[in-house]
Amino acid sequence: MATVSLIEYADASAEVKAVFDDIKRTRNVKDVNNFWKALANHPATLKRTWEAVREVMQPGALDPLTKEMIYVAVSVANNCDYCIHSHTASAFAKGMTPAQYEELLALVGMASETNALASAMKIPIDAQFLVEAGK
């Protein structure tokens, strides 16, 4: 059950409608999903979040499918059911195969396990793994 109301387009302020319109136009969808409807309770958060998502998810050095798969991985790591479902659906729509999804989940699981072990053991970082800015 949601902890905030979902703001429908008909009930939205002009400021929220403008963001909703941009989301619908950018994503070529008839309606915005529940995430955006929930954020509409705080128009400034809605606008800021949409602008950041729109910028980060636009085509760039990483292709759109790779970006969605990264979003799935982070969502699994953060245990966000909504984000797991929405970004998995988006990744499949962008061409992710079931085999890629299975491999992605196996990778997330392994990374979580090895990260926990390395953190718990406070393993010192090998010199060849140290990354410096600009290198």
Task: Describe the residue ranges of each PLM region.
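Hydrophobic alpha-helical segments
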Residues: 1-135
